[in-house]
Amino acid sequence: MKHYYLKTLNVCETLIPHRLLKWKAIRLGPCVGQVGKFICIGLNYSDHAKETGMSIPPEPIIFAKATSAICGPNDDVIIPRNSEKTDWEVELGVVIGKPAKYVDEASALDHVAGYCVINDVSEREFQIERSGQWVKGKSCDTFGPTGPWLVTPDEVGDPQNLDLWLEVDSKRYQDGNTRTMVYGVAHLIHYLSQFFTLHSGDIISTGTPPGVGLGQKPEPIYLRAGQTMRLGIEKLGVQNQCVVADK
């Protein structure tokens, strides 16, 4: 036996442990390589907008995340120096499979290569309190865990009916469904393509449901070194991250 599928590894490990590579010790990289654009959508769940004290936007809020923030789904998340407000956001990632320019909403999903889990890690002080654009609070190293899998549209079905969740130290903070998006995947692809061409390998991170640290009551809760995050989306797999301080 020369090749193993991950879904059969537990069985193989039991049957032939002396011949199976210890796959659990292997780093899994991001599920998309050579990402051109990393596009994010802000306040795209109505209840998330409410918890942040912001109104529902009349059009999608678009911002960029540096591609250098992308890392594997189980890599450590590094809290930047001088950060006290690093936060979590589980999001549905949409990966473009063929160029989209001025596409209509009806055909927009034809341009999707697949879907994945993204943790849109955010530093709220850098993002909100330091003036300017959001990009500096969204683009720190390791602030874009992506994967584990890139799942094709035929396997996913309706992208507007997927459960997504996130836990910190085994406590569930986010528990939502993509059906409550303000702007669905097809509309986002259509909308973005009116302003610039979407190319193969571009990622759209479609926003997060309520339950982020910023929205916790009676006061916000932020990540600390030594904590763990576990997050996932129905049909797309699970991520696991340790939170560490920048050295």
Regions found by a protein language model. Name each.
Residues M1-P60, T228-R230:
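N-terminal non-catalytic cap/leader segment that marks the start of a structured domain
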Residues R27, C31, H48, M54, ...:
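Catalytic-pocket segment enriched in acidic/His residues
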Residues G36-I39, E59-I61, D75-V77, E84-L92, ...:
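Generic beta-strand structural signal
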Residues S55-P73, T86-W88, L223-K235:
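Structural signature of FAD isoalloxazine-binding scaffolds in flavoprotein oxidoreductases
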Residues I61-P80, A100-K101, T142-V151, P210-L214, ...:
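Short catalytic-site patches enriched in acidic/histidine residues
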Residues K65-T67, N74, R81, W88-K98, ...:
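Short, structured patches in soluble enzyme cores that scaffold and shape functional sites
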Residues A100-V103, E155-G157:
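Short helix-loop capping/hinge motifs at secondary-structure junctions, enriched
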Residues K101-C116:
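N-terminal accessory regions of nucleic-acid-interacting proteins
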